[in-house]
Amino acid sequence: MENGKEKFSLFSAILSVICVVFVAEAAAPVAAIGNSQFFWWIVLIVAFLLPYGLITSELGTTYTGEGGLYDWITKAFDHRWGARASWFYWVNFPLWMASLAVLCPDLLHTMFGFQLNTGISLLIELIFIWVIVLISLYPVSDSVWILNGGAVIKVFLALALGGLGVYSALTKGVANHYTLASLLPSFDLHSLSFISVIIFNLLGFEVICTFADSMENPKKQIPQSIIIGGIVIAAIYMFSAFGIGVAIPTNKLSTSSGLVDSFQVMLGTPTGWFISLIAFLFMLTLVGNMVSWSQGVNNIASYAADNGDMPKFFSKRRASNGISWGAALMNGIVATFIVVIAPLLPNQDLFWSFFSLNLVLFLLSYIPVFPAFYKLRKIDPETPRPFKVSGSDGILKVYMALPMIIIIISLIFTAIPLQYDKASLTEQLPITIGAIIFIVIGELIIKRKLQVQVSQPSSSHMNSYS
């Protein structure tokens, strides 16, 4: 320990990466792709995770501190792009929080068997949201037991699901038969709309960089935890996805309850102590997700606010520990608004409605990271790089372009309606409209800041927006 602060060991850092990057609730939407998910996993692990992991390791160990991707993008380009990235990166979090909150009433129903009315369900969702807000007001090292516990529970759920899948496949057969044709991509628009979930499942490594001050040796631990954690996470995802695919036909899979449904099908019962335990553990992983992400998201939002690139309210911090209560409070307010208006939405698959919108905004924040990596190599070659991606200039361009192109293509399939039947429009139009609304709000914030900087020529950011 140093200065009385508990430090992350490498083991804790790896578990934290697993807790951050592996999100159990995303297993079912990925399984909705069908058997071809394994093809996409392999392709995206090589074409996306590898360059993304290498780039994040270099940027995270070279440019340390609270800013994360906001810092990288701002250094490479300007504050306008940094402001966009910080806005998308922050606003996805309360949407994600809302998507997990709406799962809690159904999980409690599975655990205890009683039906909840709308008022009680809303109360449970609000309790989930504001408990997360409260926990996020304390340093991440104070919650290390939540991070480690969340990682262990997620791994247990994935191994149990995959193990039951193997047993069921050997004894009862599979719901989705495996053929060479089914393992190859079909390129139907419904399946392709879920590809962004795989990318989401492979993102998040940069959050570990915001824990640098809590690590024993961040320059070594960050790349080690990303590499080891990435290998473990890829294996966990594919094993758990196999279990879901064994249990439930793809066309009957629920994106919100698919994980618990799979246990119920393979065990042959919708109730019982083990099913209740699975639902309880699954709910604990939702808390772990929010706690592990809240610190990094709030840090970046408040740091950007300090630099004039987010509304000033986000920069408000607790005097006792420097944690941003402004960003935490805004998380709670936005998530509360979302769950309150949820019953009015046309698509009542609320988890997917909010989760997919969170996906779109989250992925948007990453697009500038990859060109920022390449540009920083060109304009800032003298800065020491404890971990440096090797390769020629051509290889670096491939590392830059490949993940960026993959994100853009996945966004098109997720956010833009490419089929015009009523069911498709009901599912995708709210995502499209929601994304446009949040993009416009972000641009209005940037425009307002630009006007303020023009009226205050002494500001250090005035030229950054030009």
From Swiss-Prot:
Keywords: Amino-acid transport, Cell membrane, Membrane, Transmembrane, Transmembrane helix, Transport. InterPro entries: AA/rel_permease1, APC_superfamily. GO terms for biological process: amino acid transport. The chain crosses the membrane at residues 8-28, 30-50, 85-105, 120-140, 144-164, 192-212, 226-246, 273-293, 325-345, 350-370, 398-418, 426-446. The keyword Transmembrane applies. One of its GO terms (molecular function) is transmembrane transporter activity. It is a multi-pass membrane protein. One of its GO terms (cellular component) is plasma membrane. It is found in: Cell membrane. It holds the Pfam family AA_permease_2. Probably catalyzes agmatine/putrescine exchange. Belongs to the amino acid-polyamine-organocation (APC) superfamily. Glutamate:GABA antiporter (GGA) (TC 2.A.3.7) family. This is Probable agmatine/putrescine antiporter AguD. It comes from Lactococcus lactis subsp. lactis (strain IL1403). The lineage of its organism: Bacteria, Bacillati, Bacillota, Bacilli, Lactobacillales.
